[in-house]
Amino acid sequence: MKKIFIVIIFLVGLIIIDGFFINPKGFKIAEKKIFVDNLPESFEDFKILQISDLLISNKKDINRLKNIKAKSNERKPDIIVFTGDLINSKNDLTDKDINDIIEILKSLDCNLYKYSVIGDNDQKNIDLFNKIMNNSNFKILDNESTYLFYKDITPIKITGINTVNVKPVETKEELTPVFNLVLMHYPDYIDDLSFENAIALSGHSLKGTIRIPFYGGIIKKDGAKKYIDDYYEVGTNKLYVSGGIGTENVKFRFNNKPEINIYRLEKK
């Protein structure tokens, strides 16, 4: 009985140390290849860097953002996409902190453009979100689409989905894209997409925050009840879910290292 008690105390201590002091700090770079049918040569090895769920609430989070910027710039991505939840709705940020965030995000380098969609936390202070992203040279895609050309006449169509309304504004298709790249905060919205053969990048789930070995994430929330892990094939669409960087109400992540994501396009 005493041995069992010691084991329990040890496991609880391990969970506390990992959940509060190890996993919420730092981050990893998760890299994946995305294979695309009939990918033009111009898009071979095209790099997409995804950042999600920063959920910045204090100066420590800002310092980590500086490290993210440094690692991101080392990788020299072609485009950068942010899939929502920039500032935690509960924060103690000052005006100076906000300006620091803008300067860091502005100095994120890529060959082409930076895109963003709006997360549920961003909706709670949309004016602040718009101020930061617009001043950081991110194009906010709020239920709208844009075409990305790169060394070729055939573009990628990039669409951003709002967390309030899953269906993007209908656009008259004047060009045939290589594929549709869909950016959305809520991964569960994949079930309602009108696209086919799309590649969707999302966040929000934090991969369940607490991940139990051989089981997976255990905390599911609105917008990420069905799809919380790395990758899913849903009909003809491919869904990639980032575990993101931050935490919400409690700075706790167990067995769940924060991450930024790099996707390389390759011809199938």
Regions found by a protein language model. Give the residues of each.
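N-terminal membrane-anchoring alpha-helices
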Residues: 1-42
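Catalytic metal-binding/acid-base residues of hydrolase active sites
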Residues: 55, 86-87, 120-122, 145-146, ...
